Amino acid sequence: MPLGGHFYTAANKVRATCLVNTATHEIIDAQIGSTDQGELTLASQLSPCSHSITLFDRAYFSADFLIGWQKCAEESHWLMRAKDNLRYEIVKRNSQHDFHIRMPISTRAKKLNPALGDYWEARLIEVEQAGKIRRYITSLIDSKRYPLLALAKLYAQRWEIEMCY
């Protein structure tokens, strides 16, 4: 039926989230759901590989999700750009632009999952790229084993994910 001069058809819509190897573009795992399911809901059903680093965009920043991600598989880590309004306190300064941080867990998150506690920890790094300071947050706490420039370079591979669709 025309509506405002346009024809509309009923079409099923779905939301998908995939775990992709950025080197090979191979889809490792995928979840498909209705559009009323959020990306975090679908992503929490993915199975990360052991001894892996998953690159997320900022939409996946959630204490409950990221803590859970690390528990899904042995040495399953994550790396993402830090939000501009990130609330944290410095636990340890590894270098001028590399920090072990502690972040408060929101009241809402604690209500949904009381096992989370009051705080969670991660690593915050700052890297200058094209004249701008970029901040990244990661579960890879060991600054000697995972140098900050190597992590920033690794995150640049996140755009390879877009080549899979």
Located regions from the model:
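Single, function-defining residue in the core of a domain
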Residues: 3-165
